[in-house]
Amino acid sequence: MLARKLGSLWSRMKNITYIYVAVGIILFLGYVARADVLFENLLGFLDTSGQIQTFSTAGNFDDSNPFNQSLGTNGRTCATCHQQSDGLSVTPPHIQARFDQTNGTDPIFRTNDGANCPTADVSTLDARRSAYSLLLNKGLIRIELPVPANADFTVIAVDNPYTCSSTTSLSMYRRPLPSTNLQFLTTVMWDGRESFPGQDLRFNLSHQAQDATAGHAQAAVPLTQAQVDSIVDFELEFFTAQGVDNAAGRLDGVGGAFGGPQVVYNQQSFLGINDPLGGNPSGVPFDPKIFNIYDQWSSLTGTDTQTQAKLAIARGQQVFNSIPISITGVAGLNDVAGQPRIMGFCGTCHDTPNVGNHSVPLPINIGVADVSRRTPDMPVFTIQNNTTGEVVQTTDPGRAMVTGKFKDIGKFKGPILRGLAARAPYFHNGSAATLLDVVNFYDTRFNIGFTQQQKADLVAFLGSL
């Protein structure tokens, strides 16, 4: 039985870079050991909090799909940067394993966007380790975009540690977003550059597939429509969430919990659902209680370790839903609402029920890219407003590189909050190494005043999503 399951896994994973096959088998052995959590049509991998699981509506995980095929000229597939074991993203520990296994020649290590700068020396092992340092340490891909021709700003200086210092075509470094739970997306890409006015999600994902194959995979010819359709169909089949917690156990309907990917699949959603800014077409008022999947755990009694872990998750859900936050200085939110101070909650920006992204497009600047938070491995862009002369510095102009608007500097979307435990580090630039770092960022940025207990509970909850 075990051999047959391993053989099936090999078949599923064979078109993914071979080190991931090895990692997948190792993880699957741990998965088999948890026989009580095996489900039909569910693929699970161990992560730092327990087990991440992906459910496919197709009834299988088709390794022959173009998503898993090399369609360009550099050996990459979509799966190169969207791994099941990493919640359909990619993480530094597994990237480092691939580097060590292949001496830095795995397809993810390509200079076009895997290196800190495309001109980096990759002639020796040490040179490759240096050239791909952001990818290895933070899982960052270089994104190069031209300053829009109609921009109302000028990039007057670039301080890039890797000599990619053009002021007309900027190099930015961002985490690959997970290619799962896409049914809930309202914005494609961190900066929304693959979301087009008047177009539906399928159109946007199709456009993204073409651009990714042309850019990341360096394809010589465009994808056929059949290939695009097949990739998008494949992506839309996946729903991912944490299925097992190391301390609390199963999260998927056992003992009153309603976690796991199948619940995500069944979650009702529509554009604007629960939007606090008036975008809900149903007219139903905003409800800050975004998550209810662990409600029944809040009344548990018992002093054993597992019960205490469940109670911590339930308390963390309550913290997420109910702790008030004084939201100030968030471009794209406070200024748009005309309110210098908005008394809100986590769900003010993460409002989609039991999913956690914003249910309408909402690019905002919460300060992650502020120059004050720069680390030595990040660039700094000095940008001047062509009309007012105002000058700002940022580590990533964000949405402004799409719209050409000075007011959009530093704006990004808020991602879906499912499957977090499997895909550290966090934020667009990987600046938060852990979920506790994420919580600390918000606590400091908005002067929330979390207690240590609240922080620990919130981390436990976020890790259970």
Where are the regions that the model predicts?
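N-terminal secretory signal peptides that target proteins for export/translocation
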Residues: M1-K14
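Short linear interaction motif-like sites in intrinsically disordered regions of transcription factors
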Residues: S8-S11, V21, S298
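Bacterial N-terminal signal peptides
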Residues: Y20-F28
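N-terminal signal peptide c-region/cleavage motif recognized by signal peptidases
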Residues: G30-V32
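Periplasmic c-type cytochrome electron-transfer domains
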Residues: A35-L465
